[in-house]
A protein has these predicted regions:
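A conserved amphipathic helix/loop scaffold
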Residues: 453-678
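Short, acidic/polar
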Residues: 43-57, 127-135, 229-240, 306-314
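Hydrophobic targeting/anchoring helices
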Residues: 222-225, 230-413, 510-514, 521, ...
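A short, well-structured beta->alpha microelement
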Residues: 420-443
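N-terminal carbohydrate-binding accessory modules
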Residues: 22-63, 371-374
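The substrate-binding groove and active-site-proximal loops of carbohydrate-active enzymes
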Residues: 34-44, 69-82, 112-126, 153-154, ...
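Polysaccharide-binding and catalytic clefts of secreted carbohydrate-active enzymes
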Residues: 118, 129, 133, 137-275
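Aromatic-lined substrate-binding rim segments of carbohydrate-active enzymes
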Residues: 49-125, 132, 199-215
Length: 678
């Protein structure tokens, strides 16, 4: 297969290769589809398998995903025997269900999620043979919708022979690009491991996609990442766009939402979805796995979703632009560590209230197919940005045993999430994107706000891009240790801080304050966490205007620095993380409202704790999805910069009522409202 040659040329040509036949099959105007995964394993009766496909149909589900176990495709002589899966695909045809085939090469029975990388070249060749046989055989079924080349990439082992061989090749190429003087340049820790893991995830995913394309150039290729709040720095989504048809994800509350309490799982789903939407860019995205049922021994935080949560999670993904979702799972597997768990049918194969609730939503989507198929998320011009290098540096330096959250892995992401949460309670729809995904090529950023909250490492290559964003009218909001390190974990705030012109000064010092303390900003006390940074203002301001917004004892703790046509709001203390840890967003939100112009945004007035809204635009019509996670009924005033007329309730799971722009909505309720502007 010319493996080593391919390894050498791949890094050079990878970003230049765009396969035109990959993007034509799934587009951003496709109808929305919902479904549930049917788990196929030996021992299932013909009656039950057919019944599951019929159950999907009866509950307005159009799509399923099937895990294509190689272990269940070989007879006692080692020959291929596809009968178990042929039956499933045939019933899918009978009941008009589309199938995403999830490739799952042979692995140990206890390997629940599948291996993430091949062990060696011989293993890679076996995988290639498996892909060839499965794709050639199952592409003949009309029920085949597309391929998932690997289940939940990310977090794999890099100690195997193949990984080491690729790593050595990759490292030589990286070192050839680096010019370094050992006597004058700062020494720093190596982040080659993190960089290579990101590269390797992409390499293997593209290799699998290329193997599929040898035998099927038509059907879509889609993948579901997972644990996005922990593994985001491993995923090179812009590179994936060049060969995938669509992007997906697994968002299981019991596995992946450890940064959140259960009340805030809807918020977690919203943040997860926005990360995927940003990652997908110009290709569609589709939530590949949503938790559908109960945990007993699996998961980290065991739970059984309520029917209300099932509906909330689905509507949130739709509000973030997903072309639908598949629940894991319709039927429970009978064996293994997840036996009897996760299902949307009961042990007698009857629909649970969770399945019926998803089916109700499916009915609404079918009845309003045209409205939803062309609907796009209406972003609030607020960009909450996380930085992969910040996650790398934090993971390297953090103390897992620390009792202080600021010193634990995750503070970087939680800081970004704190702003996302605050904006969500204002009824806004912020984006949540990696710095490398942000579009720095517009001629104007008037009305746009970028948030860099405790993003501790900012690569030097972005310094001028951030200057450009602000100079062209953008507002940059910075808190915590943002910009403390460069991409090599070198502290750039000591001596001559390279961003002092943009930020409005340099940090004089940080003081560790323990747990929560207060900063008085604009005359109001804000909960702040752990670190207090004082500012030495820029003396040579080049006619820049600075406004002090936080000071005491002759020290400055916060300022606004005008720069070009925009400005920077800088508070070098973790005020976002402070609001999150205190679970007191009121003063923080009031601070944000003073410094961000929201007059052109659809929003709540006033803000509402634990209430959120996603907004879609479909032609000249609008759809608002409001979810009340508080413990009481709320009156929600929906404001817009233009007249929203003729509100009509498309879906409610309770007694929600809308009149003009006032919505009455009970605890745990969902209200999906259709508006027009004429």
């Amino acid at each position: 297969m010319g493996f080593l040659k391919f390894c050498r040329i791949y890094p050079i040509v990878f970003l230049l290769i765009i396969f035109t036949d990959m993007k034509a099959q799934v587009n951003n105007k496709d109808n929305l589809m919902i479904g549930a995964e049917i788990f196929i394993e030996p021992g299932q009766s013909d009656y039950n398998v057919e019944g599951w496909f019929n159950t999907l149909l009866e509950n307005n589900m159009e799509i399923t995903r099937i895990r294509m176990f190689e272990n269940y495709m070989k007879n006692e002589h080692g020959g291929w025997d596809f009968r178990l899966f042929d039956r499933a695909f045939s019933y899918a045809e009978k009941y008009h269900i589309k199938v995403y085939a999830n490739l799952f090469p042979a692995t140990d029975f206890t390997d629940v999620g599948g291996f993430k990388f091949p062990a060696d070249e011989e293993h890679l060749n076996r995988i290639a043979d498996y892909v060839k046989n499965v794709v050639i055989h199952f592409k003949e079924f009309s029920s085949l919708y597309g391929w998932v080349p690997i289940n939940e990439p990310g977090g794999g082992n890099m100690n195997d022979p193949l990984a080491q061989k690729l790593y050595n090749t990759w490292l030589k190429e990286q070192n050839a690009k680096i010019e370094k003087d050992k006597l004058t340049d700062y020494h720093h820790p190596s982040f080659d491991h993190e960089k290579f893991l990101r590269y390797y995830n992409t390499w293997y995913l593209k290799w699998l996609t290329d193997e599929i394309r040898k035998y099927d150039s038509v059907n879509p290729v889609h993948v579901n990442n997972h644990a996005i709040f922990n593994l985001a720095s491993q995923y090179d989504f812009p590179a994936w766009r060049t060969f995938l048809s669509s992007l997906g994800g697994s968002a299981h509350a019991s596995w992946h939402f450890g940064f959140f309490t259960r009340r805030k799982y809807a918020l977690a789903m919203s943040a997860n979805s926005e990360i995927l939407r940003s990652g997908a860019g110009n290709i569609p995205w589709f939530m590949t796995e949503l938790q559908g049922g109960n945990n007993i021994y699996s998961g980290i935080e065991p739970m059984c979703p309520t029917k209300e949560e099932i509906g909330q999670w689905l509507w949130i993904t739709i509000g973030a632009g997903s072309k639908g979702a598949i629940y894991w799972c319709l039927n429970p597997r009978a064996s293994g560590s997840e036996a009897g768990e996760w299902a949307m049918v009961d042990f007698q194969n009857r629909p649970t209230d969770r399945l019926m609730e998803a089916g109700r939503i499916g009915t609404v989507l079918k009845e309003h197919q045209q409205l939803f198929s062309v609907a796009k998320p209406l972003n609030s011009k607020i960009h909450v940005v996380h930085v992969k290098e910040s996650m790398w540096v934090e993971n390297r330096l953090a103390r897992d045993s620390s009792k202080d959250e600021i010193r634990l892995p995750g503070a970087v992401m939680k800081s970004a999430l704190s702003y996302f949460e605050a904006f969500s309670y204002m009824g806004l729809q912020p984006s949540l994107e990696e710095l490398g995904e942000f579009d720095f090529y517009h001629s104007s950023y008037q009305g746009h706000t970028m948030v860099l909250s405790h993003q501790i490492a900012i690569p030097v290559k972005y310094h001028d891009k951030l200057r450009y964003f602000v100079r062209k009218g953008g507002r940059l909001m910075i808190d915590g240790l943002t910009g403390y390190y460069d991409e090599n974990a070198i502290c750039i705030m000591i001596n001559d801080f390279p961003l002092k012109d943009l930020f409005g000064g340099s940090v004089s010092e940080f003081k560790y304050m323990g747990n929560l303390f207060s900063l008085q900003i604009d005359g109001e006390n804000l909960p702040t966490y752990a670190l207090k940074g004082s500012i030495h203002p820029q003396s040579d301001s080049h006619n820049q205007v600075q406004k002090i917004i936080c000071s005491d004892d002759h020290k400055i703790y916060g300022l606004i620095n005008d720069y070009g046509e925009g400005n920077v709001v800088w508070i070098p203390s973790p005020i976002g993380l402070g609001a999150r840890i205190a679970d007191n967003y009121k003063p923080f939100i009031e601070f944000l409202q003073r410094h961000i112009d929201l007059s052109d945004a659809i929003r709540f007035e006033p803000f509402l704790d634990n209430v959120m809204m996603k907004t879609l635009k479909s032609g000249d019509e609008y759809i608002t999805i409001v979810i009340n996670k508080s413990d009481s009924e709320k009156t929600v005033k929906i404001m817009a910069p233009f007249a929203l007329r003729n509100p009509a309730m498309l879906f409610s799971n309770g007694t929600a009522f809308i009149k003009n722009n006032l919505l009455e909505i009970g605890s745990e309720e969902i209200a999906v409202i259709h508006w027009n502007t004429h």
